[in-house]
């Protein structure tokens, strides 16, 4: 598989020096992606389709985070108010709990190479309700 095209990233669940997990299009269809080995330089990810109803919940959870991040970037909120701390936003906590099983890498997940292409535009925030400031290109290992 080599789509040749960079595809949209809707949700970033984890990041270190680059994306580690989230939700992105793979072949034009929303999938979870999760780094096969976060300590390796190679960008190999397990990918698996996300059910439409779960996709809606992921986007809702992401929107809560993005709204917090906007306040954080403006200096109006501190890290202690991050919804991921728990007990800050009841709906966020509920969504996180409901989404845990779907975020687990299934035995039939595909292994792909993912390359991130970051947008270099000071006017575009890193995180937006529509997604992230990068796209992914997928290919076979």
What is each stretch, according to the model?
Residues 32-52:
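Short linear, low-complexity motifs centered on an aromatic residue
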Residues 2-38:
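Amphipathic, interaction-prone secondary-structure segments
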